[in-house]
Amino acid sequence: TTQGFAIYGRYAFSMHDKGQCVIIDLKRNRLVNTFILDGNTGHCNNASFGVERYSRKSQFPLFYVTECRGERACYVNDITTEGARLVQKIFYDGEEITGPCDWAVDAARKRIYLYCTIGSLRWLKWFPLPQLADSDDKGEVHLQAEDALGSIPAGDIAIPQGSHIYKDVIFLMMQNLVQQLSQPR
């Protein structure tokens, strides 16, 4: 099943468990390719495009994918329709987090959002979107609590899978809402 989903131009990128990426040409309504993202063995809950490109020759802007199980990292990829290369990992080093993390990018505002569990509450924190130049010698960025631009309790969001953020508005698909809308009236 699809965990994360992002669209850029005429292409849809459907992310599945353990890093499987399925690319669909929306204009021609056909499958383009499927492959495993470099290094991502997680659940791929969210997928987003940023604004920076790895190089002038890059087919797409950098592609951000949540790895929510193991490292709780955001994997940043230079992606094409033929494959992807891991170019950066983003971590939050706050010790207060007790559960999985999910990441989503607001490209319009150049921010990255982190859904996390602190104690028994879900929180949303946001940070300036790191650039590739911010990486250390291992290709990693480690965000700290003091780097946050803000944070709010996120309420009863059990699973932020499939989130999309655009200009400070978060779009979240909630299973109960989908079930309610699909019920005959």
Where are these regions (language model features)?
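Short beta-strand elements that form the blades of beta-propeller/WD-repeat-like
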Residues: 8-16, 56-68, 109-119, 168-175
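A short beta-strand motif characteristic of beta-propeller blades
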Residues: 1, 30-38, 85-94, 139-154
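Structural motif
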Residues: 18-23, 70-78, 119-130, 178-185
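Structural signature of eukaryotic scaffold interfaces centered on beta-propeller domains
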Residues: 1-8, 43-60, 95-113, 156-168
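Loop/turn-rich, solvent-exposed surfaces of beta-rich toroidal or solenoidal domains
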Residues: 153-184
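Blade-loop segments of beta-propeller domains
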Residues: 28-68
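Short loop/turn segments that connect beta-strands within beta-propeller blades
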Residues: 26-29, 79-83, 129-133
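Beta-propeller domains
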Residues: 8-40, 180-182
